[in-house]
């Protein structure tokens, strides 16, 4: 499911995306004990630490989850050092021992990040990822977790990132975002 917000307020987009993810995937556990995860790209460490983390912490508490289900993953700066054990938590995201549900990211995870249990992505503002990487970043959540089983995913975008995604889909796959969204009407079984 691709959701495009007409709001320019990044906080509003993130709040709606997190709530929709938790409403639909909070209790989702895939084969092998992998819990569904949501990735939120934040653009800057300060935004992650000062805006997104407090917002997401409040929302998960409303859903009966603790802050231990949120991973802040960035390389740190002078004001906000890299969170303790975050690299280890990131490395085990796709293992049954990981209980992380929401991953907050800054400039990480766009290349070579293969997390099958990633079920949703939020790109709420321009600059959350490089302009030429919107397709690759937003489609991180489209990997099959259990072979042959029907699965869904959530991609939450602001209008800027939706336009970039549409352009990149047309350039690289010769389809529009509208065709991409309607793809679930023509389901195929992957072998």
Report each predicted region and the residues it spans.
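Conserved C-terminal RecA-like helicase domain
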Residues: 5-114, 128
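Short secondary-structure junctions
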Residues: 68-69, 177-179
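Conserved RecA-like P-loop NTPase helicase motor core
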Residues: 76-177
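Residues forming the flavin
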Residues: 183
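The feature captures the C-terminal accessory region of ATP-dependent helicases
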Residues: 186-191
């Amino acid at each position: 499911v691709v959701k495009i917000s007409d709001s320019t307020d990044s906080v509003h987009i993130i709040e709606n995306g997190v709530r929709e993810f938790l409403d639909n995937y909070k209790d989702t556990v895939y084969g092998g004990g992998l819990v569904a995860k949501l990735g939120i790209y934040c653009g800057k460490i300060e935004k992650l630490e000062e805006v997104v983390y407090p917002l997401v912490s409040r929302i998960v508490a409303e859903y009966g989850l603790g802050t231990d289900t949120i991973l802040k993953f960035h390389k740190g700066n002078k004001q906000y050092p890299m969170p303790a054990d975050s690299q280890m938590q990131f490395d085990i995201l796709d293992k049954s021992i990981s209980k992380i549900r929401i991953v907050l990211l800054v400039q990480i995870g766009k290349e070579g990040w293969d997390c099958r249990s990633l079920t949703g992505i939020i790109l709420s503002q321009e600059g959350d990822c490089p302009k030429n990487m919107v397709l690759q970043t937003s489609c991180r959540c489209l990997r099959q977790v259990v072979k042959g089983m029907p699965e869904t995913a959530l991609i939450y975008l602001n209008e800027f990132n939706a336009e970039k995604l549409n352009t990149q889909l047309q350039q690289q796959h010769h389809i529009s975002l509208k065709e991409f969204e309607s793809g679930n009407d023509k389901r195929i079984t992957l072998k």
